[in-house]
Amino acid sequence: MDAMLIKNWNSVVGYQDDVYHLGDFSLTSAERSLRILEQLNGNKHLIKGNHEKSVLEKSFTREKFAWIKDYYELKVEDLDARGNRQSIVLLHYAMKVWNKSHHGAWHLYGHSHGSLPDDINSLSFDVGVDSHDYFPISYEQVKRIMSKKEFKPIDHHD
């Protein structure tokens, strides 16, 4: 399984690409995690999930990531987005509402392994590799999916 995941990752991620991994990177030892990390292309950023112990316990694995955070609000330059920048909230877990969700911000998450139903009325999406044939999903792929959705608030905000 490791070899397939590494091959799939490297087939779509270039050496200079930024990759945001939304948690549960590894359930194995720090040493095995390091061997995997050293084979993966890209500038790796990690949003902590509930299975990061082996990655977080050793500095030699932590150092393979540009940063490690619990939560992150990403801004992507995109001429099609409002203000030419797409706001994206990254968290391991799915949320019903998130910062700027009422203003077109997307929410990307993992954790659920494709078990949550996709909501056409929510600009959120499960980007876990097990939901996408074990390949990382690109910004352009997410953008195509989000373009088919329409946000409808479920709380008191408009």
State what each model feature region is.
Residues 62-154:
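Conserved beta-sheet core of the metallophosphoesterase superfamily
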Residues 1-73:
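Core catalytic region of metal-dependent phosphoesterases/phosphodiesterases
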